[in-house]
């Protein structure tokens, strides 16, 4: 594949990932959060394990000490993140969810500086400040009274917690893979499996008999889309892109996800876009770019090389 074709494929992947916010918003109207988490990764399992068995036959089954880090990563980065992600979509818009989700590299960098003495360059500091300012605009929609009265949308706060979970996953996965000799594909496959196992009792707790009979084809197709296009195909294309054009250049394409989400949210879901949300989106994307651009060599770009899983 030429670099141009890889770039086009990464644009397509950004559309896949942005579509997960749209289909997630559709699906939460019919399924509770734990059920969506369970079914999304249950449907993805056959595909991701087939890829693991074909590409890395030596990594088919974890050995001894490899299980504990996989359990921790599966719990924090897959189960907790996606349960919170789907919960947030019950209360907030797909636009807000995607813009707050775009903060992942920023929060990852912030935690790396705070807990792992990661170096904070001027461009990364500016990126942090801009991104937090942008999310402030998105959450408040320019209404400063929300701040003084501490009245924030529940879904926005839940999504912020979800991003923190994924940032912790990002930092831990980088270290665990080096320490326990885990490949990105092996981590992805087994965190999917662990998520399915952990979410199953919660899925039963939500009493599936009360809602499964009334679910529609669009609800199931939304889950299937998230499983195949956002989780499996998105991962594969990102992995190819990292091999062809490198992790830093691949990470830049994540900045397109909020843009495509805004377009799809307006055209498909009929969500409204205010001037403050557009301003917030521009500021967030600028901040993320400053933090993830190749020259910055941020924690996020290093993480992209070792763990190719996206927040959608």
Question: How should each PLM-predicted stretch be described?
Answer:
Residues 1-11, 57-58, 105-164, 282-312:
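Juxtamembrane helix-loop boundary signature in multi-pass membrane transporters
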Residues 5-9, 35-51, 72, 127-133, ...:
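Hydrophobic alpha-helical transmembrane segments of multi-pass integral membrane proteins
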Residues 14, 37-39, 78, 82, ...:
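Helix-helix packing/entry segments at the starts of transmembrane helices
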Residues 14-18, 73-82, 105, 139, ...:
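Transmembrane alpha-helical core positions of polytopic small-molecule transporters
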Residues 16, 20-21, 49-101, 137, ...:
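Specific transmembrane alpha-helical segments of multi-pass solute transporters/efflux pumps
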Residues 20, 42-47, 100-114, 129, ...:
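Alpha-helical transmembrane segments of compact multi-pass small-molecule transporters, enriched
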Residues 23-26, 30, 44-62, 133-149, ...:
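Membrane-interface helix-cap regions at the ends of transmembrane helices
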Residues 27, 36, 40, 88, ...:
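Hydrophobic/aromatic residues within transmembrane alpha-helices
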């Amino acid at each position: 594949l030429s670099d141009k074709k890889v770039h086009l494929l990464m644009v397509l992947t950004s559309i896949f990932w942005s579509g997960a916010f749209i289909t997630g918003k559709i699906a939460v109207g019919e399924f509770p959060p734990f059920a969506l988490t369970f079914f999304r990764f249950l449907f993805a399992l056959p595909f991701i394990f087939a890829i693991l068995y074909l590409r890395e036959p030596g990594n088919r089954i974890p050995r001894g000490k490899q299980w504990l880090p996989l359990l921790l990563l599966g719990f924090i980065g897959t189960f907790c993140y996606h349960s919170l992600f789907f919960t947030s979509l019950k209360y907030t818009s797909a636009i807000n969810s995607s813009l707050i989700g775009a903060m992942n590299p920023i929060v990852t960098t912030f935690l790396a500086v705070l807990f792992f003495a990661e170096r904070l360059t001027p461009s990364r500091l500016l990126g942090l400040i801009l991104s937090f300012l942008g999310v402030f605009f998105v959450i408040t929609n320019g209404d400063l009274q929300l701040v003084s009265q501490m009245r924030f949308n529940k879904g926005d706060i839940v999504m912020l917690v979800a991003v923190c979970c994924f940032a912790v996953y990002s930092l831990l996965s980088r270290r665990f893979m080096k320490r326990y000799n885990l490949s990105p594909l092996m981590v992805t496959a087994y965190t999917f499996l662990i998520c399915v196992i952990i979410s199953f009792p919660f899925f039963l707790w939500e009493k599936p008999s009360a809602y499964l009979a009334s679910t529609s084809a669009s609800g199931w197709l939304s889950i299937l889309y998230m499983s195949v296009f956002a989780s499996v195909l998105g991962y594969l294309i990102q992995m190819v892109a990292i091999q062809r054009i490198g992790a830093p250049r691949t990470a830049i394409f994540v900045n397109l996800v909020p843009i495509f989400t805004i377009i799809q949210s307006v055209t498909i879901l009929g969500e409204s876009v205010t001037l403050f949300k557009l301003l917030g989106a521009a500021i967030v994307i600028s901040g993320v770019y400053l933090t993830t651009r190749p020259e910055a060599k941020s924690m996020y770009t290093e993480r992209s090389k070792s763990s190719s899983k996206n927040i959608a």
